[in-house]
Amino acid sequence: MKIFDYEDIQLIPNKCIVESRSECDTTVQFGPKAFKLPVVPANMQTVMSEELAHWFAKNDYFYIMHRFDEAARIPFIQKMQKDGLFASISVGVKANEFKFIEELADKQLVPEYITIDIAHGHSDSVIKMIKHIKKYIPKTFVIAGNVGTPEGVRELENAGADATKVGIGPGRVCITKIKTGFGTGGWQLAALNICSKAARKPIIADGGLRTHGDIAKSIRFGASMVMIGSLFAAHEESPGETVELDGKRYKEYFGSASEFQKGEHKNVEGKKMFVEHKGSLKDTLVEMQQDLQSSISYAGGKDLKSLTTVDYVIVRNSIFNGDKD
């Protein structure tokens, strides 16, 4: 098995067939809806808020609301659907979450998307939850994860998941690899590659992206959608406190398994960091789209499909030589 990560790979250009990169189409069909970009902000408290979710849905971007304010989920679904927007929520696998799914069915509330969101998704508890959701609200598009192996993808798909999320601890504020010795940190792109070969349904690549070019690489190695935390954190619209250090503005960004998230120091696999303030999220989304349009033009196509067939070389950490000065 070839092992590599994002910084080890360069995609090889094909002849350009467009006059301008603006002709390149970055839209993606994911589940029941089509979106402007194959990108979704991480469902973390310092990345996604109800206000942002509303804005993303209204502007045809995919979002997944985090699961850390359980009582707010039903009002959130009701508000989104009342406003004619899609509802996309997260659930865990504790006993109360199974009751929550039954409550949704009782109220005839069907969110368009539900993400089963736990760190080690290749587990009996996730399989039970997939089946539970499909029994009570079968029309919901179920995303399950996270996994890091082809076996994990196959099992969750076979249980009824409509998409799987791949990535165990490669994110900037995830320290699973340090705390446990396990994970896809350092070989996330290779993990995506082997998982996508086993998949019959869409995959979300989750974590480890550091640049916009990594979005194109994720699509090349089998992702339909890419989940991004740190690149979306620390914007004007982002949740989280702003601090000033040495005359520069920063925003907090912490992992979902950090003690800041949990409120206690128990089974901690996430950390907190301050990321330099990045301005408007809307500007970042425009830049992401333009960069991805450029990627498509280099791939010699007009849409995302062209990225899936380009050749690549493995260059072992050398692509940033001289770029970080």
UniProtKB/Swiss-Prot annotation:
Q: Which SUPFAM superfamilies match?
A: Inosine monophosphate dehydrogenase (IMPDH)
One GO BP = purine nucleotide metabolic process
Q: Which UniProt keywords apply?
A: NADP, Oxidoreductase
Record PROSITE patterns = IMP_DH_GMP_RED
Residues reported to bind NADP(+): 203-226
Origin superkingdom: Bacteria
What Pfam families does the entry give?
A: IMPDH
Q: Which GO terms describe its cellular component?
A: cytosol; GMP reductase complex
One of the entry's Gene Ontology molecular-function terms is:
GMP reductase activity
Catalytic activity field: IMP + NH4(+) + NADP(+) = GMP + NADPH + 2 H(+)
Question: Active-site positions, per UniProt?
Answer: 174 (thioimidate intermediate)
For whether the record's keyword set contains NADP, the answer is: yes
E.C. code:
1.7.1.7
Family under the similarity heading: Belongs to the IMPDH/GMPR family. GuaC type 2 subfamily.
- What function is annotated for this protein? Catalyzes the irreversible NADPH-dependent deamination of GMP to IMP. It functions in the conversion of nucleobase, nucleoside and nucleotide derivatives of G to A nucleotides, and in maintaining the intracellular balance of A and G nucleotides.
In terms of HAMAP family, this protein maps to: GMP_reduct_type2 (MF_01511)
Q: What is this protein called?
A: GMP reductase
